[in-house]
Amino acid sequence: MTLVLKPGSVPLETLETIYREGLPVRIDPAFHAGVEKAAARIAEIAAGDEPVYGINTGFGKLASIRIAAGDVATLQRNLILSHCCGVGEPLSENIVRLIMALKLISLGRGASGVRLEVITLIEDMLKKGVIPMIPEKGSVGASGDLAPLAHMTAAMIGEGEAFYKGERLPSAKALEKAGLKPVVLAAKEGLALINGTQTSTALALAGLFRAHRAAQTALITGALSTDAAMGSDAPFHEEIHTLRGHKGQIDAGRALRALLEGSVIRQSHLEGDQRVQDPYCIRCQPQVDGACLDILRQAARTLEIEANAVTDNPLILSDGRAVSGGNFHAEPVAFAADQIALAVCEIGAISQRRIALLVDPALSFGLPAFLARKPGLNSGLMIAEVTSAALMSENKQMAHPASVDSTPTSANQEDHVSMACHGARRLLQMTANLNAIIGIEALTGALGVELREPLTTSPELAKVIAVLRGKVPTLEDDRYMADDLKNAAELVVDGALAGAVSSGILPSLEA
């Protein structure tokens, strides 16, 4: 199956499908005429006498140097080779596929001036599985993601490396094995390919999709913890949240009510419970998780716009002029990444406090210490809670805003940068930490509920526990725990826990 993209209006759901399923994509042929028109205009400018940045001049601080018409192709090739300065581990295939799809969307708007054969090559590489090797580090998020996108483009011209059928090869060999030929870049094409925010945006989108799934699952594990601790569902009453008015809070409260509906555990202590109020990590879940949901939704709107944007320079305007601007500056992406980081950090922080509550017999309302069936002989989930604290602390350190840490580059021509790529890339580690924290809460919450037997939890949460127990058996005695934590985290990552509950309960990214 190949997804057909309409540049300028590709929805978030399609972008998530590209990220998660790795489907090949192509541009709607209706946009080809606009692409060819802009390419023809670039060819006219290149043949003329007027200097235009990036077409017949040098780049960055070297923009004042005029390039002879006979050197234009060499200029583009040199640009790509000189900018391949990435370091670190290769980005994963699903991230690179998303980067390439975003580049197609941008080029397909018909304002960049590349020839149709450039777009076709990217489409064919995605279809046949030639995936450029892009190192993870090297971009400051302005002027675009130059180094990582140069590595992408290098593969297109037969330079650098690419992955093909799981093998890392010289790009020329990978293209040959796939039956493809490298492209010879014409005027401006190299610049159009590397001068954009697609790497930062792809990483931020990946962070967003991972964070949203974790946020949904955290509502489930939070409900489990509430029932395990014999907490009250009264703070989730609809009117409390409508009186405040925040959409995320309202949606989170609604989800928690639905998840806990029908719990016999809850019914057992509706009367005679001497506890007046639960701790904040139980009582304030709608307020905290809802606020996180709100900023994830705000980031989603920003990133959907950016994914459909034209972010190279110069641009071919509707009147045919080539005009220099600054759409390559990824400040919106940097801000969105920082917002996502805050949400990821806070979801993990409140989840960790619920884990700590459940393993503490002074707070858990009758549960054994560390949820061990034979405390003392067994340590139960003692160190699982410690691990969750370690991961929470690491995320707090990583949540520092990246966007405020600009530094001048390129001989002060590029004197303010966004740091969007770094800000977005750290989301991969932060969400991995969060998935592990939520997985640990799933283990503690489910075990806590099981220790309340013969009282039973709600039908929705019972389905979640059944999915969990299909991969992680209940803890009777101490055992090697690392596999349990790994398997529980995988149930968060692959959406199995979120998918266990009835459709419509968990809030989407739609505001």
From Swiss-Prot:
GO molecular function: histidine ammonia-lyase activity
Cross-link (5-imidazolinone (Ala-Gly)): 142-144
Pfam family, one: Lyase_aromatic
Subcellular location: Cytoplasm
Keywords: Cytoplasm, Histidine metabolism, Lyase
Enzyme category, top tier: lyase
CDD domains, alphabetized: PAL-HAL
Catalytic activity, EC: 4.3.1.3
Residues recorded with modification 2,3-didehydroalanine (Ser): 143
Reaction catalyzed: L-histidine = trans-urocanate + NH4(+)
Keyword Chloroplast: no
PROSITE patterns reported in the protein's UniProt record: PAL_HISTIDASE (PS00488)
Any single biological process term in GO: L-histidine catabolic process to glutamate and formamide
Post-translational modification as stated in the protein's UniProt record: Contains an active site 4-methylidene-imidazol-5-one (MIO), which is formed autocatalytically by cyclization and dehydration of residues Ala-Ser-Gly.
GO CC annotations, alphabetized: cytoplasm
Pathway: Amino-acid degradation; L-histidine degradation into L-glutamate; N-formimidoyl-L-glutamate from L-histidine: step 1/3
PANTHER family on file: HISTIDINE AMMONIA-LYASE
Family, similarity comment: Belongs to the PAL/histidase family.
Name of the molecule in the record: Histidine ammonia-lyase
